[in-house]
Amino acid sequence: MSVLVIRASKRFAVRRPVTLHGPGKKRDGLMIELSSEGCRISNAERGLYAIDQEVTLQLDEAEHIPGRVRWAHDGFVGIKFARALRQTELGQLLQTSRAPEYSLAC
């Protein structure tokens, strides 16, 4: 039996290398889903992240987004941003996260 989940924000498929910073931790991952409220990261080390743990998503040298872990299992981590992205921020992030250089690098 499947369960229908209604989401507050539309999700977009992306493919962008990121670094996830937590207390005493810094790990690389791949952002595979993005919304104005948060994102999903794959290639996350199992058992490294706890629900409600504060993290910072590093997109590049200058761009960091604070948030909290909503869930973590099977090498995936769901992050809820500390504040929702504005429409322009989301649009710019989608554009750069779908750029050809990220698709080739992964």
What is each stretch, according to the model?
Residues M1-C106:
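Structured alpha-helical
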